[in-house]
């Protein structure tokens, strides 16, 4: 097939078994983590998706807590379609694109992207990974495109490190400034965008000291703990739109 189909379940507590059109698609243990199943070979024009959820399992962490272990599908379920070249969908429910800020201070910031890319086609293909960085106001700061190729069936990690961003606006709880990094896979021959992921990032750094306590962006910062359970009336742990 020229398209791939994936079922993403953001959370089902505590264990889930999934069937598509009566055939086993996969299972997952853990009520607080997302998971993705490749259902490409199971999908047809009209589909029946059956998800059986069990919250009675006592061998799945957390084994004990002072709150109620609710059961059921309590976060969104998605059917995702991709081309044969796409970001890796088999990395523990993630997007396959990981963004960090190895340099973050009031003078300069650097963005690093590590993207896992998969080629599900039966032949080698030449691609480009394109990254665009926008500031909090939506202004394009940097753009970059680096070529690479993948063999048939290969998954590889492609890395990118930005040029220095001068005087970045730092993130704080009082002023949570966020930049945006858009990462795309592009067909090197046709220029077609095959897959694209957008991530928000904040430039900040922190440290701990036995005498000075916690510091954010080089300044002492008081931490305030909040004892709030993932539980609310009348929906329990469910998250609405």
Where are these regions (language model features)?
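Hydrophobic/tyrosine-rich beta-strand signature of extracellular beta-sandwich/beta-rich modules
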Residues: 51, 131, 181-183
């Amino acid at each position: 097939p020229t398209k791939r189909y994936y079922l993403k379940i953001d959370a089902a507590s505590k264990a889930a078994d999934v069937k598509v059109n009566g055939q086993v698609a996969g299972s997952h243990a853990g009520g607080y983590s997302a998971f993705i199943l490749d259902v490409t070979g199971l999908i047809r024009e009209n589909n029946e998706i059956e998800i059986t959820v069990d919250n009675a399992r006592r061998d799945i962490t957390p084994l004990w807590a002072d709150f109620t272990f609710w059961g059921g599908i309590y976060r969104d379920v998605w059917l995702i379609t991709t081309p044969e070249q796409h970001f890796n969908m088999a990395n523990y429910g993630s997007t396959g694109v990981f963004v960090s800020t190895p340099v973050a201070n009031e003078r300069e910031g650097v963005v690093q992207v590590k993207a896992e890319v998969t080629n599900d086609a039966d032949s080698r293909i030449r691609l480009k990974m394109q990254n665009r960085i926008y500031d909090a106001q939506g202004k394009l700061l940097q753009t970059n495109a680096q070529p690479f190729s993948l063999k048939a069936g290969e998954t590889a990690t492609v890395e990118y490190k930005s040029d220095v961003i001068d005087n970045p606006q730092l993130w704080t709880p009082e002023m949570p400034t966020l930049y945006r990094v858009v990462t795309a896979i592009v067909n090197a021959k046709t220029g077609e965008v095959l897959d694209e992921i957008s991530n928000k990032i904040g430039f900040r750094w922190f440290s701990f000291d036995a005498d000075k306590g916690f510091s954010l962006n080089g300044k002492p910062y008081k931490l305030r703990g909040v004892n709030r359970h993932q539980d609310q009336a009348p929906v329990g742990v469910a998250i609405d739109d």
